[in-house]
């Protein structure tokens, strides 16, 4: 029992330190597989931010996909950062609840060119899986880079920032990260 408690405490601490809600961990673990089967038109990232926040010109989150075969002959490795496009909402929309007073949603989806690129990546994986000689598998990493968006006025640096994700319209959005723009910038600097 003591060991179970320590594991729970460790998981809780880890999630709290990174800003990832514990309830999201099971869905995040399924994300790579879901992305390979997802309709690219359904994929969206929603940010709930202070209503005064204005994204820097040209700054958009990127869908980062890294796909590496164990056997380099199986298929060509993929390392792509696909740009998303913006829509703004101050009311309930797309299954998201209305933001509290003083906040708004920035909703990012895949533009047509990015949808086509994601479909190409999905086809590459399906083709590799269908190939009888493909037995070795590979690694798939999926993330959403949003550090460029966090460049904000100092007055907003410590306001709440929530990141929500949808891979399939039927499943809706789920929260994947919460913190502040300052924390987001700090994470982006660590990744460089």
Region spans (language model):
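Positively charged n-region of N-terminal signal peptides that target proteins for export
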Residues: 1-4
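C-terminal motif of bacterial Sec signal peptides marking the signal peptidase cleavage site
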Residues: 13-16
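Bacterial signal peptide processing site
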Residues: 18-21
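Post-signal peptide N-terminal segment of mature Sec-exported envelope proteins
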Residues: 25-46
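Residue-level recognition of well-ordered beta-strand positions that form the cores
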Residues: 46-48, 64-66, 139-145
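Short amphipathic, basic-aromatic surface patches that mediate peripheral association
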Residues: 48-54
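Structured domain cores in non-transmembrane regions
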Residues: 55-134
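Glycine-rich, aromatic-bearing surface loops/beta-hairpins
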Residues: 98, 129-192
């Amino acid at each position: 029992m003591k060991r179970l408690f320590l594991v729970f405490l460790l998981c809780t601490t880890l999630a709290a330190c990174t800003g990832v809600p514990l309830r999201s961990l099971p869905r995040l673990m399924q994300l790579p597989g879901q992305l390979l089967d997802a309709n690219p038109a359904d994929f969206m990232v929603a940010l709930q931010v202070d209503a005064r926040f204005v994204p820097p010109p040209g700054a958009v989150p990127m869908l980062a996909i890294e796909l590496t075969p164990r056997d380099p002959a199986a298929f060509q490795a993929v390392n792509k950062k696909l740009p998303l496009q913006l829509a703004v909402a101050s009311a309930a929309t797309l299954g998201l609840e209305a933001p509290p007073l003083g906040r708004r949603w920035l909703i990012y989806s895949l533009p047509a060119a990015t949808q086509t690129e994601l479909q190409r990546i999905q086809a590459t994986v399906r083709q590799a899986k269908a190939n009888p000689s493909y037995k070795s598998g590979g690694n798939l990493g999926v993330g959403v880079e949003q550090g460029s968006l966090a460049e904000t006025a100092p007055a907003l640096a410590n306001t709440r920032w929530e990141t929500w994700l949808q891979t399939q319209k039927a499943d809706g959005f789920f929260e994947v990260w919460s913190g502040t723009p300052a924390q987001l910038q700090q994470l982006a600097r660590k990744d460089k």
